[in-house]
């Protein structure tokens, strides 16, 4: 075992002494050493329940014949960090998390890892570490929050109800009392935000990839089932160490295609494009951005999930969860191994039935195409991403007038000040991985558009990204980004922009000659942040179309 490096032989006397200083008995010295990477924090509702799950994982490890050690991993809440300087840090923490897990596991020669995670960037960061290390690992996602409850049976969703409520209040649609009800009821307790936002989408994709146990992706944070899954994951990691089953044997090209199809079928968060590309890179799997669009054209959307639809995670779990989606997709799914031991199709076949009001059959899809589309054009020669499941039929094709802003903050001020009107295309740039830096989420602007009643008359394009809670005609991940000299930085107020999602096209209607003249005048702006982690990040991060990964090149 890897841990023999620190437990066996005369030369390791000092190492054993230090381990015994933690309370480790001599009798446990030869057992598999299992690291429990926990992202517990009481700053985030998605992570406040992890102390309980830690105990169940620990019990499982010891029942399985291993010896466990806890180590801490940071977590950032995208909701709390939204709309201010904090959002610059969200995506970069994904890289920090992967590096921290790698560092602790390698420094202490751990034999296997249980990765306890939940919210947006923590789960992909953990998966990136697992793929990079390629030692036995299993993921436990802490589970979704229950929907909020209001008067007359109303259900509240944190993302759609609170962020859009601000704009509705500003527009006079709701009063002080209703705004207060939203705030009080939107988050009833522990768990990740209730709809198919980034955290829950990534939990579902983790299960689909085979890196967590069945139902882990949808079992509610408050459920006893989640605790049993945590215990079983602790037991299972010891078996994985003994059998030397490692992540790269699970994270194959076919497994990634399964994850993309499930993502498309559910209408999941567009952030998953960034994360799956990054995880695939760590796993040594070639996964071009175009793969998402190729699969979208042949994978219908089978569920109508909040934020764009009516169903919450609690509904999806009861309807059949990930296994239910796999079952409905049928032959579109590859039969891949999972950490549980059963194959993907064996897990799907074990499900007795599916609630087809929630997870539709292929014969009766919600939409003919999957939830994510990849666009190209003279604004985005290396690609852009739109969550088409959240776009109304009216806005699938749209021509409008450019209104340009060089930051999210300036765009928000204009929207809330009534400057943006129907027929506009809001262009938010210099918010990409390098330019942001950190590729901030644009939930506040998109929620403002919906709340102000402009969702069917204004489009938004950006080299930043969007929250899983975003809905409406919002195109992100534009590559190359403005800070790298991308064409989005050459658009001027008054230009005509043509969006055609069915044709996968996004263009500014000016000639190549005009764009060349503008490029000759373009000057790269000064970095917004010149010291600290974000300054270093901006120098090494790649484009959105490659997953916004950091490289040594």
Swiss-Prot record:
Molecular functions per Gene Ontology: 2 iron, 2 sulfur cluster binding; dihydroxy-acid dehydratase activity; magnesium ion binding
Top-tier EC class: lyase
Name this protein carries in UniProt: Dihydroxy-acid dehydratase
Keywords per UniProt: 2Fe-2S, Amino-acid biosynthesis, Branched-chain amino acid biosynthesis, Iron, Iron-sulfur, Lyase, Magnesium, Metal-binding
Keyword flag Iron: yes
Metabolic or biological pathway: Amino-acid biosynthesis; L-isoleucine biosynthesis; L-isoleucine from 2-oxobutanoate: step 3/4; Amino-acid biosynthesis; L-valine biosynthesis; L-valine from pyruvate: step 3/4
Gene: ilvD
Essential cofactor(s): [2Fe-2S] cluster; Mg(2+)
CC terms in the record's Gene Ontology section: cytosol
GO biological process: isoleucine biosynthetic process; L-valine biosynthetic process
Iron in keyword set: yes
Function field: Functions in the biosynthesis of branched-chain amino acids. Catalyzes the dehydration of (2R,3R)-2,3-dihydroxy-3-methylpentanoate (2,3-dihydroxy-3-methylvalerate) into 2-oxo-3-methylpentanoate (2-oxo-3-methylvalerate) and of (2R)-2,3-dihydroxy-3-methylbutanoate (2,3-dihydroxyisovalerate) into 2-oxo-3-methylbutanoate (2-oxoisovalerate), the penultimate precursor to L-isoleucine and L-valine, respectively.
Protein family (similarity comment): Belongs to the IlvD/Edd family.
PANTHER family (alphabetical): D-XYLONATE DEHYDRATASE, D-XYLONATE DEHYDRATASE YAGF-RELATED
Originating species: Citrifermentans bemidjiense (strain ATCC BAA-1014 / DSM 16622 / JCM 12645 / Bem)
